[in-house]
Amino acid sequence: MKILATETKLGRRVQSGGCAIHCQNCSISQLCIPFTLNQHELDQLDNIIERKKPIQKSQVLFKAGDELTSLYAIRSGTIKSYTISETGEEQITSFHLPGDLVGFDAIMNMQHPSFAQALETAMVCEIPFDILDDLSGKMPKLRQQIMRLMSNEIKSDQEMILLLSKMNAEERLAAFIYNLSQRYSARGFSAREFRLTMTRGDIGNYLGLTVETISRLLGRFQKLGVLSVQGKYITINNMAELIELSGTNKNKIQLII
């Protein structure tokens, strides 16, 4: 899978999808399971992966309570993870980008505790968990990479707890935008110009803020000259000031990619 870039009317580099056959041809493989594997190991991994048809916007990949049968590596698009409370309220827990693996939180009980839903048309690689588990026992590099990815997810959860407990509203949104810019940069896209694939409502839900607060803060950031907003497109004009607004240095939080 190659992540391609297209030019919009606004001249921004936007994520889009194109198909490829093997893991070694995937432009985000360094962020995914294939990283560090040799050719023979890549071939073994390739043999168990099912490259699914496009998942349409709003389509659910799996639901809370579903049995864990596979992990899903995102090839293109964005997927959100969320839970639903007893009162029917949705709580977003993660936004997954290309290179991320979805489904790790189901390993303990072999049952998904959350939902995964596409925020836009997405492509995923389905990796049968039982076969992957067996392969990882035979391939130390594969096992190490899975452990690295799981550790990364745990650290991300810890940073989110710190963000919500230590930061005010302005710092939360600034940290979110900065973290998103770094994640896009790691995937070969511009760190300064990108499209928000999630709604302001989704961002507010994730950060524990209202839609009105998100809109007000985006307006404030624009007035300060930190960033420009045009619809879903964000342009970061002053990265240093954005980092300062995020309070990551003050709170000693290192947001992960």
Curated annotation (Swiss-Prot):
Q: Is Hydrolase among the key words of this record?
A: no
Q: Which Pfam families does this one have?
A: cNMP_binding (PF00027), HTH_Crp_2 (PF13545)
Q: Which UniProt keywords apply?
A: 4Fe-4S, Activator, DNA-binding, Iron, Iron-sulfur, Metal-binding, Transcription, Transcription regulation, Virulence
Superkingdom is Bacteria
Q: Where is the HTH crp-type domain?
A: 167-240
Any one Gene Ontology MF annotation carried by this entry is: DNA binding
Q: Which InterPro entries match?
A: cNMP-bd_dom, cNMP-bd_dom_sf, Env_Response_Regulators, HTH_CRP, RmlC-like_jellyroll, Tscrpt_reg_HTH_Crp-type_CS, WH-like_DNA-bd_sf, WH_DNA-bd_sf
Task: Indicate which residues the UniProt annotation says bind [4Fe-4S] cluster.
Answer: 23, 26, 32, 125
Q: Cofactor: bound how, per the entry note?
A: Binds 1 [4Fe-4S] cluster per subunit.
Assembly with partners or alone: Homodimer.
Name of the protein in its database record: Anaerobic regulatory protein
Query: Which species is listed as the source?
Result: Aggregatibacter actinomycetemcomitans (Actinobacillus actinomycetemcomitans)
Its gene?
Answer: fnr
